[in-house]
Amino acid sequence: MFDFDGTLSLIREGWPEVMLPMFEELLPSVNDDDSASVRAMLLDDIMTLNGKQTIFQMMKFAERVTERGGEALDPLEYKHEYLRRLEVRIQSRVESLASGDAKPVEFLLHGSVALLDCLEARGWDLYLASGTDEPFVRREAELLGLGRYFGERVYGAQDDFMSFSKKQVIERILRENNVGGDDLLVIGDGYVEIEDGKNVGGLAVAVASDEARNGAGQFDEWKRKRLLGVGADIVVPDYRDAAVLVDVIVGK
């Protein structure tokens, strides 16, 4: 089971640079505010919930607004405003992929196709599960040419947020394939999928990708430490050594 954004797709690279300023703009101020500490608090909230549905980040932000004596909006309203701002940021990327002006490889984490080809060649069933709304995940997976790997096995966030979680997808995968957790491989850059995979006995490959410098082969140290902290078995910056990674996964 793959996560999507930051694990395969870079179309939404820079999304924290949209969410964080929005939160800073909308958070009520208090007398003893220190802008640096407020920013650090909000960023920690955002990244701690990375991998869960976007609505959970909005629910946490609504709590912060209330804590400061503000009148919080419905978290869904915050989510819709965030998605509106993010769509402005990524619109040119989506349009350039749709028109053919950009090639999918420009917006795929380095080595993604090689890794997917290696796993597919072994006959493994590949699933995609994302905290991004499902229609966007399906749109962007197709733009990146990933549909042939995942088919209909693509899952994303729903407006009824209780009807989707990566834990639920994992449970469904195990049930439908009649396998135990030790047959599950989870690959992602968010702590949620790593933790959920480990909780059922799966193997977890964490992707501490530096999305802004794709192909540099450098770790995002914040991600690396956080993902190791929740039990990742392997941490990679990208998939430049896809064949070697698969050999390690299967115990060669």
Residue map of PLM features:
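Substrate-recognition element of Asp-dependent hydrolases with the DxDx(T/V) motif
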Residues: 7, 19, 103-107, 112-142, ...
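A short, structured active-site edge motif that brings together acidic residues
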Residues: 76-77, 147-163
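Conserved Lys-Pro-Asp/Glu-containing loop-to-beta segment of HAD-superfamily phosphomonoesterases
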Residues: 164-197
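Non-catalytic pre-domain segments flanking phosphatase-related domains
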Residues: 1-2, 38, 43, 47-50, ...
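Acidic, Mg2+-coordinating phosphoryl-transfer loop and its flanking beta/alpha structural elements
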Residues: 130, 186-234
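A metal-dependent, Asp-based hydrolase signature
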Residues: 44-106, 110-121
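Short acidic-hydrophobic, aromatic-tinged amphipathic segments that line or gate anion-handling sites
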Residues: 155, 233-239
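Active-site neighborhood of HAD-like aspartate-dependent phosphohydrolases
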Residues: 1-40
